């Protein structure tokens, strides 16, 4: 069984959707492309949820890629909830796109890229993988927040989100570098042992862990 099969399928499907929409844009109008991408996006997300259901319970508590990706109960149910909610949003998004006069097909692709980043974040088992997954979904959300270029509110929201995201990412990276310098590892399982066994007088370890936690909380709030 392949633990990251849903992520692999979603990533390969996204590459196909990008190529499909790019070549189709030469011959067709954007509204037609958007409808095609929307239906294909719903199908891809539905199949990804099925892959999570089909393979998730069979490979629980297993890891791949040198323990950077893990499949446990938390990641399984988190991916299932994220995939279901995203599928529900895609099914309801067409009236909003028509009402807001958004004809660009990239809107759907950005949502799928954000879902891919969230899937990887749920399965990440070290700081580097978690950071890359956070940045993948954050970049998609930056563009989605400022997608309506003619709206002052949309552009303002995108700029504020970008600044907050950059600040929280810097805190996360700074705390991660300090933790790696002190412990020599970036694995979450080893961090759990460190957090449990850290002595009360060791303020350096506690402050480094607090920086990473503060960065994660700041990312979630923003």
Over which residues does each language-model region extend?
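Alpha-helical transmembrane segments of multi-pass membrane proteins predominantly involved
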Residues: 1-222
């Amino acid at each position: 069984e392949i633990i990251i099969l849903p992520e692999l399928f979603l990533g390969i499907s996204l590459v196909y959707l990008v190529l499909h929409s790019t070549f189709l844009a030469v011959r067709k109008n954007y509204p037609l492309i958007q409808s095609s991408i929307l239906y294909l996006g719903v199908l891809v997300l539905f199949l990804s949820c099925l892959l999570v259901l089909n393979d998730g319970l069979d490979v629980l508590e297993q890891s791949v890629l040198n323990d950077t990706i893990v499949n446990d109960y938390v990641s399984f149910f988190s991916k299932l909830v994220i995939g279901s909610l995203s599928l529900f949003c895609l099914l309801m998004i067409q009236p909003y796109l028509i009402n807001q006069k958004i004809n660009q097909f990239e809107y759907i692709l950005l949502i799928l890229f954000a879902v891919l980043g969230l899937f990887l974040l749920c399965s990440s088992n070290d700081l580097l993988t978690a950071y890359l997954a956070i940045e993948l979904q954050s970049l998609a959300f930056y563009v989605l927040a400022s997608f309506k270029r003619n709206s002052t509110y949309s552009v303002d929201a995108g700029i504020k989100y970008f600044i907050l995201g950059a600040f929280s990412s810097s805190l996360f990276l700074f705390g991660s570098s300090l933790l790696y310098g002190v412990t020599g590892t970036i694995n979450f399982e080893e961090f759990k042992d460190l957090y449990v066994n850290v002595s009360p007088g060791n303020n350096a370890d506690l402050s480094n862990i607090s920086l990473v936690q503060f960065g994660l909380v700041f990312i979630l709030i923003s």
